[in-house]
């Protein structure tokens, strides 16, 4: 089997595990996270991003003063179109 080479991606995703020795000194051991850990981390981050977007959206919504049905419809359509252009790249 070929040995896996370090890339910027694998280097940036390495976890540092700190283990105590019997003498009380600490040593660091680098290890790559498995796929489950990476997916868990990704989902946690995306969930935080989604919550932030919802909060910003509601703040904008609440900041509208006496919105009419027409102005709300226009605003929602603009946001929907911009979201569709961006897709999953947010």
From Swiss-Prot:
Domain of life per record: Viruses
GO terms classed as biological process: symbiont-mediated perturbation of host apoptosis; symbiont-mediated suppression of host cytoplasmic pattern recognition receptor signaling pathway via inhibition of MAVS activity
Subunit structure: Oligomer. Interacts with human SLC25A6/ANT3 and VDAC1. Interacts with host MAVS.
Native source species: Influenza A virus (strain A/Port Chalmers/1/1973 H3N2)
Primary role: Plays an important role in promoting lung pathology in both primary viral infection and secondary bacterial infection. Promotes alteration of mitochondrial morphology, dissipation of mitochondrial membrane potential, and cell death. Alternatively, inhibits the production of interferon in the infected cell at the level of host mitochondrial antiviral signaling MAVS. Its level of expression differs greatly depending on which cell type is infected, in a manner that is independent of the levels of expression of other viral proteins. Monocytic cells are more affected than epithelial cells.
Misc remark: Is not encoded in all strains, and seems to be dispensable for replication.
Site-annotated residues for Low pathogenicity: 66
Region (Mitochondrial targeting sequence): 65-87
Residue segments, region Disordered: 1-31
Family named by the database record: Belongs to the influenza viruses PB1-F2 family.
Primary localization: host cell
A Pfam family that the UniProt record links to this protein: PB1-F2
Name of this chain's protein: Protein PB1-F2
GO CC annotation: host cell cytosol; host cell mitochondrial inner membrane; host cell nucleus; membrane
Subcellular location field: Host mitochondrion inner membrane; Host nucleus; Host cytoplasm, Host cytosol
